[in-house]
């Protein structure tokens, strides 16, 4: 999963994940925002994980928009697709297919490659490295300096009905609500 700055081609954050699901994408996006700031907009493909209401809520809290690429239009995602091709040819191609490594080891090597190679290499479309171009625009980047604010942006929000005994269920766990007599039978928003 990767997020790329459209103008500079800087990878704001990327990592290999066991699954490409919403929670993995959310973690990568959160790290991208923590490291490189809040984007003006996020341009994604049509994948289910990018069309979720949760992503819309996260982006709304940060004050950025989400736009989805047209279906079956690979040109509209050319920059990120070109980056993935670069990962395959300049990073993954160096691996011995017989070598056993963990996901953590793979990501450690990947992060080093990103910072030491990809982010530093002069890009033919900009005549600058992605890092140099991005840093030249740094005064326009809205950083999140308070980790609590960042955590608040990325909280999941779901509705739950308070059971008669004053409990709610979230991810197969039961929680007792405050004021169970008042809230029993009512719907509440849960943030986690």
Predicted stretch roles:
Residues 9, 42-45, 77, 117, ...:
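Short, conserved catalytic/metal-binding motifs centered on acidic residues
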Residues 118-192:
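C-terminal, beta-rich DNA-binding module of retroviral/retroelements integrases
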Residues 56-151:
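Charged alpha-helix within mobile-element recombinases
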Residues 30, 56, 165:
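Short glycine-/small-residue-rich flexible loop motifs, especially phosphate/cofactor-binding loops
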Residues 1-34, 38-48, 69-71:
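A short, conserved beta-strand element enriched in hydrophobic/aromatic residues
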Residues 50-53:
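Short, well-ordered alpha-helical microsegments
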């Amino acid at each position: 999963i990767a997020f790329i700055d459209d103008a500079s081609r800087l990878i704001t954050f990327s990592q290999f994940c066991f699954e490409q699901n919403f929670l993995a994408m959310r973690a990568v996006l959160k790290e991208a925002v923590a490291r490189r700031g809040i984007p003006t907009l996020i341009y994604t493909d049509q994948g289910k994980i990018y069309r979720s209401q949760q992503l819309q809520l996260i982006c709304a809290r940060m004050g950025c928009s989400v736009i989805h690429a047209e279906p079956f239009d690979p040109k509209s995602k050319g920059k990120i697709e070109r980056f993935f091709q670069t990962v395959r040819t300049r990073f993954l191609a160096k691996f011995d297919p017989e070598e056993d490594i963990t996901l953590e080891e793979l990501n450690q090597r990947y992060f080093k490659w990103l910072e030491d190679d990809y982010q530093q290499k002069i890009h033919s479309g900009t005549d600058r490295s992605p890092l140099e171009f991005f840093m030249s625009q740094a005064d326009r980047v809205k950083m999140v300096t308070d980790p609590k604010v960042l955590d608040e942006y990325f909280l999941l929000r779901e509705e739950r009905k308070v059971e008669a005994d004053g409990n709610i269920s979230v991810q197969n766990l039961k929680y007792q609500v405050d004021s169970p007599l008042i809230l029993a039978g009512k719907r509440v928003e849960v943030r986690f």
